[in-house]
């Protein structure tokens, strides 16, 4: 009894096979199943007239068993070449045995669908699948700690690369300001150390010689570079020419920008943005602005 119960409760795995047949006036189709161990279903999809069918009425009929086990006949489709050459049944399922026939018309009529078979799965294959799933789960848990550490490292590396790129861009834009700040910090550090270390020595020398001696501080690289900067100051950029300013304003307008419409605001705009101080050139630019 227990073995029979186990066989009844075993899961079923469906398999699908293509089905098709041709009906004519003198040609029926009998769908039978010799293997009774598995469940079979015939799922009909479409019924259509074949090439060469006459423009006449075709009636397709199916004969099978009803719930009580008695034979029953059902009309599946009514076709005519000029009106309705094909009909979709949308999955009309019938349990075999089934007889498909052409009740009216000469044909040919083609019927297509699927043959569904429910196959029992082996218990051994299920056990093997479960063992494979368990092994995969164990390997995934073991590899989880190592895999979790790799992601943050990659993120940190990416963040460091992004920070380095940003710092490189800022260094390229503000190179002069950074050099000046570094030189000031380098200049302050040795001065403090020398002031702390040399007061006693300077006091002794001043007492011996009777003269006030200035504390000797070693020259730092920052002082030398700072003096070089004082000797060679950068030449300020001069004002742009009138034609260059017009070209830049025109480009700004083409990009969607706007210029001041009031003369006083326009003059301030030219002086601040283009460092233009020539009044004649400013008036020339204002006349050009009004002509736009």
UniProtKB/Swiss-Prot annotation:
Residues 201-210 have a biased composition (Polar residues). Its main location: nucleus. Residues 241-292 are annotated as: Required for nucleolar localization. Decamer formed by two pentameric rings associated in a head-to-head fashion. Disulfide-linked dimers under certain conditions. The SWAP complex consists of NPM1, NCL, PARP1 and SWAP70. Interacts with NSUN2 and SENP3. Interacts with the methylated form of RPS10. Interacts (via N-terminal domain) with APEX1; the interaction is RNA-dependent and decreases in hydrogen peroxide-damaged cells. Interacts with isoform 1 of NEK2. Interacts with ROCK2 and BRCA2. Interacts with RPGR. Interacts with CENPW. Interacts with EIF2AK2/PKR. Interacts with CEBPA (isoform 4). This is Nucleophosmin. The keyword Ubl conjugation applies. The modification N-acetylmethionine is found at residue 1. There is a cross-link at residues 228, 261 (Glycyl lysine isopeptide (Lys-Gly) (interchain with G-Cter in SUMO)). The modification Phosphoserine is found at residues 4, 10, 43, 70, 125, 139, 225, 240-241, 252, 258. Acetylated at C-terminal lysine residues, thereby increasing affinity to histones. ADP-ribosylated. GO terms for biological process: cardiac muscle hypertrophy; cell volume homeostasis; cellular response to hypoxia; cellular response to testosterone stimulus; cellular response to UV; cellular senescence; centrosome cycle; chromatin remodeling. One of its GO terms (cellular component) is protein-containing complex. InterPro entries: NPM1_C (IPR032569), Nucleoplasmin (IPR004301), Nucleoplasmin_core_dom (IPR024057), Nucleoplasmin_core_dom_sf (IPR036824). One of its GO terms (molecular function) is DNA-binding transcription factor binding. Residues 187-199, 221-233 have a biased composition (Basic and acidic residues). There is a cross-link at residues 27, 32, 141, 150, 214, 246, 248, 255, 261, 265, 271 (Glycyl lysine isopeptide (Lys-Gly) (interchain with G-Cter in SUMO2)). Residues 1-185 are annotated as: Required for interaction with SENP3. There is a cross-link at residues 32, 246, 255, 265 (Glycyl lysine isopeptide (Lys-Gly) (interchain with G-Cter in SUMO1)). Residues 1-117 are annotated as: Necessary for interaction with APEX1. The modification Phosphothreonine is found at residues 75, 95, 198, 217, 232, 235, 277. Belongs to the nucleoplasmin family. A motif (Nuclear localization signal) lies at residues 152-157, 190-196. Residues 159-186 have a biased composition (Acidic residues). Residues 186-214 are annotated as: Interaction with NOP2. Keywords: Acetylation, ADP-ribosylation, Chaperone, Cytoplasm, Cytoskeleton, Disulfide bond, DNA-binding, Isopeptide bond, Nucleus, Phosphoprotein, RNA-binding, Ubl conjugation. Transmembrane segments: none annotated.
């Amino acid at each position: 009894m227990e073995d029979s119960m186990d066989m009844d409760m075993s899961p079923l795995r469906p398999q699908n096979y293509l089905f098709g047949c041709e009906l004519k006036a003198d040609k029926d189709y009998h769908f039978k199943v010799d293997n009774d161990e598995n469940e079979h279903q015939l799922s009909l999809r479409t019924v259509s007239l074949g090439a060469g069918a006459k423009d006449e009425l075709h009636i397709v009929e199916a004969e099978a068993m009803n719930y009580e086990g008695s034979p029953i006949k059902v009309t599946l489709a009514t076709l005519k070449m000029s009106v309705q050459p094909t009909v979709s049944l949308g999955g009309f399922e019938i349990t075999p045995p089934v007889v498909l026939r052409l009740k009216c018309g000469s044909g040919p009529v083609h019927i297509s669908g699927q043959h569904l078979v429910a196959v029992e799965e082996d218990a051994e294959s299920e056990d093997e699948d479960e063992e494979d799933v368990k092994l995969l789960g164990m390997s995934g848990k073991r590899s989880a700690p190592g895999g979790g550490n790799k992601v943050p490292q990659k993120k940190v590396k990416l963040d460091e690369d992004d920070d380095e790129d940003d710092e490189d861009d800022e260094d390229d834009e503000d190179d002069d300001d950074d050099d000046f700040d570094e030189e000031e910090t380098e200049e302050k550090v040795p001065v403090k150390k020398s002031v702390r270390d040399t007061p006693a020595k300077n006091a002794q020398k001043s007492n011996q010689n009777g003269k006030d001696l200035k504390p000797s501080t070693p020259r730092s690289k920052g002082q030398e570079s700072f003096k070089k900067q004082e000797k060679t100051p950068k030449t300020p950029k001069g004002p742009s020419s009138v034609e260059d300013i017009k070209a830049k304003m025109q480009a700004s307008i083409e990009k969607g920008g706007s210029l001041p419409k009031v003369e006083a605001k326009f003059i301030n705009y030219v002086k601040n943005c283009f460092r233009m101080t020539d009044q004649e050139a400013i008036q020339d630019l204002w006349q050009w602005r009004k002509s736009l």
